[in-house]
Amino acid sequence: RGFAKLPNDMFAVSEIGRISIFDSNLKQVNTLKHDFFGFLHTIILSAGREKMLVVSGGYDSIFEVDIKTGAIKWSWFGWDHGYNPRQQDGAFLTYDRRQAETWQRQGKKAEFVAPQLYGKQGLVTAGRTTFPNSAYYNIYKDESTIVATLFHDGEIIEIDRETGDVCVRLSGMNIPHSILPLGDGWLVTSTREGCFFTLSPT
């Protein structure tokens, strides 16, 4: 679903649960993996071309990955930043077993999400709380924030990289996808409506 041209005539392709790196001769030279890589979507390079944003829709998350080492430099889970509980059944999701147990003691329905149980697809579509499906470094703010589309919520959000806090830039969309810079702003599709929107940079 994702493709990015890398330095030295290499390129990256996001598969379901991993990112494959190829050289100019189409030889696979590296594979980047993480437990919470699931149902991957877009991959976008940073301005310095040393890192990339990886959208893991299957686990309601976005990662920044070092291209050479595969190390995670930054991460964001919707579950930690207001996108909980799940609409389907009211269950609170977490990657922290102790947090799940605490919620359960409080009488809440909670699910400890262990990637070993769900694999490279992650949670099923209806089992996700947000389902981010595209993200981009905010080039208008020196990449200090990330803009992203949320499938379930129909939102365009801006994420503060320091805190993970979210500002909703646009809501009420019907399955938004593919936020990209356009001119001095942003272009995004509202897929089910068959239309697109342009947004100001701030």
Label every model-predicted segment:
Residues R1, K33, K73-T130, T202:
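Surface-exposed loop and turn segments in beta-propeller and other repeat-based domains
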Residues R1, L6, S178-T202:
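Loop/turn-rich, solvent-exposed surfaces of beta-rich toroidal or solenoidal domains
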Residues R1-I21, L26-I44:
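Blade-loop segments of beta-propeller domains
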Residues L6, A12-I16, V54-Y59, V147-H152, ...:
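Conserved beta-strand positions in repeat-built beta-propeller and related beta-rich domains
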Residues D35-G38, G127-T129, G172-N174:
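Short loop/turn positions that demarcate and connect the beta-strands within blades
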